[in-house]
Amino acid sequence: MEHHEDLHLIVVSPESTLFDGKVEIVTLPGELGSFSVLYDHAPLISTLIKGEIKYTEDELEKSIGISSGFVEVRDNIVSACVEI
């Protein structure tokens, strides 16, 4: 029996909401290297560096280019506040 769980990804900049929706996986450009977040990931807070936030939505990989920011992961919600 296959059971699929989703994360909720929210990416905001000072100007607008860049993405707000369900994703299967998100990969973020952390200060110590890129890292991926899946469903039921441990809580964390991290700074983000220049790079791309990559995520899979409806089996399609998409990305958002950023210059810096920070991210919080908690209760299957990935909240990123970024500069683009």
Predicted regions and their residues:
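Compact, glycine-rich, soluble single-domain proteins
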Residues: L7-I84
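Short, charged, intrinsically disordered terminal tails
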Residues: M1-D6
